UniProtKB/Swiss-Prot annotation:
Its main location: secreted. This is Endo-1,4-beta-xylanase A. It catalyses: Endohydrolysis of (1->4)-beta-D-xylosidic linkages in xylans. GO terms for biological process: xylan catabolic process. The gene is xynA. Belongs to the glycosyl hydrolase 11 (cellulase G) family. Residues 29-221 form the GH11 domain. Pathway: Glycan degradation; xylan degradation. Induction: Expressed in cultures grown in medium containing D-xylose or oat spelt xylan. Transcription is completely repressed in the presence of glucose. GO terms for cellular component: extracellular region. InterPro entries: ConA-like_dom_sf, GH11/12, GH11_AS_1, GH11_dom, Glyco_hydro_11.
Amino acid sequence: MKFFATIAALVVGAVAAPVAEAEAEASSPMLIERAGPGGINYVQNYNGNLGQFTYNENAGTYSMYWNNGVNGDFVVGLGWSTGAARSITYSSNYQASGGSYLSVYGWINSPQAEYYIVESYGSYNPCGAGQSGVTQLGTVCSDGATYTVYTDTRTNQPSITGTSTFKQYWSVRQTKRTSGTVTTGNHFAYWAKYGFGNSYNFQVMPVEAFSGTGSASVTVS
């Protein structure tokens, strides 16, 4: 998981910076034997021990509580071993302070890229004003709202294949929400104008946090 450097600098109490090893992240999730609703077949559990992570893959539900603060970065949730331009329906009770996201998250194999469709977040807008090295690409109107689109290049950073240079693509919902449907294809089509490919690696609907406290109970299909 990568965060813009200016956000990392703002996070009080973070160890080094809230940058997780993406390669370890990719190896941490596990395939599940029986698919849940919507074909869910993937459990994302990166540093779930930083809080209390529980899940029921057959029901498409998970919960995470991090009420003692976060000393590091975690990414936990449910999704698919192979991404697609799918519509993802979710509902949640998501409450977070500090640095946290509720998003659709995944990777593209070639050209390698990491992506977020951020539905809600805690105190820090991941692409807020003043972020260095970030290029705004306009807006996408999708699912009844406007998302601001950004890109960023990560140079010699941890990725799903080790250390590499890759792009990040972000769509951040201008009005936060905690339930609804995300039509990922609308974002992918817009990002494709700027080099986003369609060689999908995993795709999940996780909660992520690298500071503060919070809780999330999420249903995904």
